[in-house]
Amino acid sequence: MTTHSAFARNQWYVAAWAHEVGRDLLGRTVLGEPLALYRTQEGKAVALADRCVHRRFPLSESRLDGDKVVCGYHGFTYDTTGTCVFVPGQKRVPRTARVSSYPVAEVDAFVWVWIGDPEAADPTTIPRAPHLADDGWVTVTGMEPVDCDYGLLVDNLMDLSHETYLHGGYIGTPEVAETPITTEVDEEAGIVRVS
């Protein structure tokens, strides 16, 4: 059975700001996939499916023991590859006891995840934003929950010409509406650049 999505699965997606991913488990959803993100003791970012194979308990609400995630419900323990390495009360761990792990890349100030075919994950295709991690630039970060369809946000964030008319006086100026827009399409990489 083929599943259809409005989003391409074989693409890199930002899962978090790099500073958000640490030694505490962080839950995020990317393309409808719940993820548990964390860093190993050496600082490498990890992304696992955020549901224990046993009772579907969120691993992001569990705890770390070294580099392993210990489920907060019954103690099933997973390594960084998503393989269950310990089940309390059992001498043998079932071969099928594993959660999905996802390719992760940390580029500039972001932790990126690849939800699609892991063999196709190429970190060199990640769009760069080096200024975000450059001390010569000021970057303001934050989250703003908005109760709307993602399409409305995309439409508004990609259409800067409306700033002059709707947001005039504080972020919109006549120069914004007059600025030429350049669009580049890299079909091979699956990237659209607008500047």
Protein language model features and the residues they cover:
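Rieske [2Fe-2S] iron-sulfur-binding subdomain
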Residues: 1-45, 65, 77-195
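A glycine-rich beta-to-alpha transition motif near the start of alpha/beta enzyme domains, typified by
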Residues: 49
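Short cysteine-rich clusters marking metal-coordination/redox-active sites
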Residues: 52, 71
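Conserved HGGG/HGGXW glycine-rich cap/lid loop of the alpha/beta-hydrolase fold
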Residues: 56-61
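Conserved sequence/structural motifs within the catalytic ATP-binding
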Residues: 68
